[in-house]
Amino acid sequence: MKKILVTGGSGFIGTNLIEYLSKDTQYEIQNIDIVKPKISAQDKYWVQVDLRKHDAVIAAVEAFAPDYVIHLGARTDLNGKTLQDYDANMGGVSNLLDAIEVAGTVKRAIFTSSMYVCEPGYMPKNFEDYAPHTLYGESKVETEKRIKTANPFYTWSIIRPTSIWGPWFGEPYDKFFHIVLNHMYFHMGKRACRKTYGYVDNAIYQIMSILQAAPEKVNRNVYYLGDYEAYPITDWANEIAKIEGIHIPHVPYWCFKIVGWVGDFLKKFGIAFPMTSFRLHNMTTDNVHNLEPIKSVAPNLPVSRIDGTKVTLEWIHKYE
């Protein structure tokens, strides 16, 4: 039986990954996370560990003695005020690297970074070309640099999930669904954009494909994760609306600008609002990533966008 350690297994992607792994009898699973799992049936795999605590991480990894590590644990929100607020990402990966070395049992590891090591719309020249636009993105740049500098002896890869969505997701990627469902989405004509999104089951297929590929094919490589066809946002919104019987009206772009300014103003007072200038910029900026490297490892995605959308809507109606 192969032992797989998942960090951050109580998060969105982690919850779906644990669910997938738990159905395969060849794996013994452990999830180390600071928070409880979202699904109570996954409690048996969970050990409460704060990735920022060096000794606790070493103790947990050494005790489990994993064959494989999938590192998903991170702080992912954009609310931090300083880079140090994201030490779970930077110090966390350093602690994990130390722990894996101490354990001495790991054959492969996959470390999670983020597409936000570059701002939306920026196309990096290579995987050492960084252009973060948030503190979170800066923390993930530092995460990647620490892994590459350590250059561990085992087979390792870095993944950069794009806009992953599906059951058990949260802000910001659930916002799009809720905006459409609450009749708050409006088409903005030619300002609509195309982006790389990814259904969560497809992302898990990609992760597992990296884990199972020949070492020489994936070692020291960086991969963006996402569905292989970029999404025109207008088309996806129409699919959600059609399933739910919702009509989406068209509104001039300048109206969105005003609503974004209102959201900016309310944010200063700690009031959540579905639209801000930052979000509008993201909504109107093409952000299509090169997925050819991961496609060569994981060529056949298991779930179409429309099928994933139907499953996600069923989950929203059941759990939210």
Question: Where do the model's predicted regions map?
Answer:
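Active-site Tyr-X1-5-Lys
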Residues: 131-157
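Mid/C-terminal beta-alpha module of Rossmann-like enzyme folds, strongest
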Residues: 213-274, 303-305, 309-313, 319-320
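Substrate-positioning beta->alpha
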Residues: 169-175, 189-212, 220-221
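A hydrophobic C-terminal alpha-helical subdomain
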Residues: 257-297
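Conserved Rossmann-fold NAD(P)-dependent oxidoreductase catalytic core, especially the SDR/UDP-sugar
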Residues: 95-135
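Flexible, glycine-rich beta-alpha linker
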Residues: 118-119, 157-175
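NAD(P)H-binding glycine-rich loop region in Rossmannoid oxidoreductase-like domains
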Residues: 44, 51-89, 102, 120-124
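N-terminal Rossmann NAD(P)H-binding glycine-rich loop of SDR-like oxidoreductase domains
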Residues: 4-24
